[in-house]
Amino acid sequence: MSLDLLLRGAVLVTPEGERRADLGIVGGQIAELTDEIATPAAQTLDVSGLHVFPGVLDDHVHLNEPGRTHWEGFETGTQALAAGGATSFLDMPLNSSPPVLTRERFEDKARLGEEKSLIDFGLWGGLTPLNLDQLDDLAECGVIGLKAFMSHSGLDEFPAADDLTLYEGMRTAKRHGLVVATHAESNEFTRRLTETARAQGKSGVRDYLESRPVVTELEAVQRALLFAQDTGAALHLVHVSSGAAVALAYEGKQKGIDVTIETCPHYLHFTGEDVERVGAALKCAPPLRDPAVQEELWRELLAGHIDTVGSDHSPAPPDMKTSEDFFSLWGGISGAQSTLNVMLEDGYAQRGLPLEIIAALLALNPAQRFGLPQKGRLAVGADADFALVALGEKFTLDTLYDRWQQNPYRGQSFQGRVHATYLRGQPVYQNGEFTGTPRGRLLRPRSL
């Protein structure tokens, strides 16, 4: 046997920790991992001085194709992801138009992804009052899970799931072994607070932040946990913004509820004070919190109570992010390129978070949660998906690859630059260049 590619002098970030070893690849998979590989190779790459991370599996991305490619599409979105060390992502059922609520919409988006995506991808299906009768079909065609909003999504074509819809959707998901992801904010609470603020003529940044307090997240998390406990469904709480909500969900996990917890890099890197300074580029829901709440979130992460960190990349054209009325602006942050950067800077460099924990949060844990055993780790038999990172290199992020440049991470200083990203042993990104043609494949989950 000969290898297709041999990495020499690597520092591998494995589930057990950092390991100096060689890595051999055959047919897109890791074939050897040992201190010194003697097997001949068609190509040998000296990666001395670099860390080899498992490719990021971003479990929360909005690429909006078809229908809203002018917001973000597979081509530009996956370039940004690859430049940030990602080799796989899970695309949300909105904001493509129409959203992924049926088998037909799933198949349309899957076809476009296989034509255009640089990296591998899975597709979430929607869970709304409009498509309860379509969930069996979506499960059969291979959705990675079902996504529900417990508050208004911002798009009328993807309405919020009322309590019965969410409950029945969880029962269906349980039957198919699928995860249900929830945007957990109280619909009634946030709607009434928003109406009251606007009736009083309030329209500023702080007015918006105060219209979605932490308690609106806690109330929705509690309900989602109750429904998951009663149905036995697997629950994934997305973009959790507060330490209190993490603690509540983790308590449920300790009681036996099948729940995982995702937060996002913007909640870890920016605060509500930054929103007041930066403006529209940092509007999201749940909103960014005050510094004390952010520190509580970090404490929960450092305690091991958070399972995944996903970008929630959700850009929009500049005209949707320009208004004197902050309530009317599109809520979404461009962050596909920066998740690993944030975790290396704010987690590893500033707080001593071990590299293997970062790799678990960004790769291993989402791969395990969503039934993707070939992904998420550097191990013999796994797909040869990895990023080459100069861990000690400090830089300012000034080159971005997503469609719109209204990006809050521009100009931020980070430690740990991604030099290259490899998908199944082939480079897709190298030092500012994208190599080859789109080669992304559709990922379908194995039964949980």
From Swiss-Prot:
The pathway it acts in is: Nitrogen metabolism; (S)-allantoin degradation; allantoate from (S)-allantoin: step 1/1
**Keywords for this entry?**
Hydrolase, Metal-binding, Purine metabolism, Zinc
Under Pfam families, the record lists: Amidohydro_1
Instruction: Provide one Gene Ontology biological process annotation.
Output: purine nucleobase catabolic process
Tell me which cofactor or cofactors this protein depends on: Zn(2+)
The source's domain of life comes to: Bacteria
Which residues hold Zn(2+) 1?
H60, H62, K147, D312
| The gene coding this protein | allB
Q: What class of enzyme is it?
A: hydrolase
What GO molecular function annotation could you give as one example from this UniProt entry?
Answer: allantoinase activity
Q: How is the cofactor bound?
A: Binds 2 Zn(2+) ions per subunit.
Tell me what reaction this enzyme catalyses: (S)-allantoin + H2O = allantoate + H(+)
Any idea what this protein is called? Allantoinase
What is one cellular component GO term in this UniProt entry?
cytoplasm
Q: Which InterPro entries does the record match to this protein?
A: Allantoinase, Allantoinase_bact, Amidohydro-rel, DHOase/Allantoinase_Hydrolase, Metal-dep_hydrolase_composite, Metal_Hydrolase
What family does this chain come from, according to its entry? Belongs to the metallo-dependent hydrolases superfamily. Allantoinase family.
Q: Which organism is it from?
A: Deinococcus radiodurans (strain ATCC 13939 / DSM 20539 / JCM 16871 / CCUG 27074 / LMG 4051 / NBRC 15346 / NCIMB 9279 / VKM B-1422 / R1)
Describe the processing and modification events after translation. Answer: Carboxylation allows a single lysine to coordinate two zinc ions.
